[in-house]
Amino acid sequence: MKTLLKAACVASVALVPSVAAAACDEGEVVIKFSHVTNTDKHPKGIAATLLEQRVNDEMNGKACMEVFANSTLYNDDKVLEAMLQGDVQLAAPSLSKFETFTKQFRLFDLPFMFKDIDAVDGFQNSETGQAMKDSMQKRGLQGLAFWHNGMKQMSASKPLLSPEDANGLKFRVQPSDVLVAQMEAIGGSPQKMAFSEVYGALQQGVVDGQENTWSNIFGKKFFEVQDGITETNHGILDYLVVASVDWLDGLDADVRDQLLTILAEVTETRNAEAFAANEQAKANIEAAGGVIRQLDAEQRQAWVDAMKPVWAKFEGDVGADNIAAAQKFNESGS
């Protein structure tokens, strides 16, 4: 194992010599964490930075973590294959990025699956949630922790108060068949597009609207080039911290156990703070002059009725049992 670790160190130094040489001591397990967001404003970036700090403080001499933010090492479309090749040890792609490994995570893209973030939390921390994290083991990946961004809202170049308002509009979506079907269900034209391209596309009218969390809408200033944001809370944008099965199995038990304990503690802390971060982002949008529209119960139900038929199209991929398990956490007191 020491030979493999030395090789990992050499590879890391070759990629970013100044960072690797300064950060890691010889003999430490090098843990490269690749993600696509900034480090200080985005819930995922903040969580990754906290994890890095704690691992390097508490596991000094045993392990060394290096975080590569803003796609400086890999983007989310390439990082999982790089992980299977041993070139990166941890990543946290959005759940739609696991399409080629499992269809079960399509559950989280189904519109109005969860009533709020507490229901999401309950499901992800349940036995079914753990089984979903384990569902890619045969493909060489192990899910370790769900990280929240938050609930998704809708925005466009015109007010969106009813599903009919979306008819004929072009909406940016992540590369997810579920999200494509969701937009088609309300008469929209879904356009798959990288996150980094969205602001310019909205500004230039390449697309008319998008769906995202408050933190993303504020952080990327989408509200500046939209008529307003409608608070729909129709979906969840989350990430899965993942590692390769081979790498995890190759760690000494004490290193693996301590790493997973720290990860669990960081996850609990940052997931709780992600909700507050989104609420602050929402307030910041309003303070900056952005328009936020609320739906009354009747209006919201119209969106539910328009989008919910999407569930039937993907029940075979997601699993009826998983859908039923998720719905239990929408019930009061679950």
Model-derived features: positions:
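N-terminal secretory/targeting leader peptides
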Residues: 23-119, 127-130, 136-334
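Short, low-complexity disordered leader/linker segments with a strong preference
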Residues: 1-30, 333-334
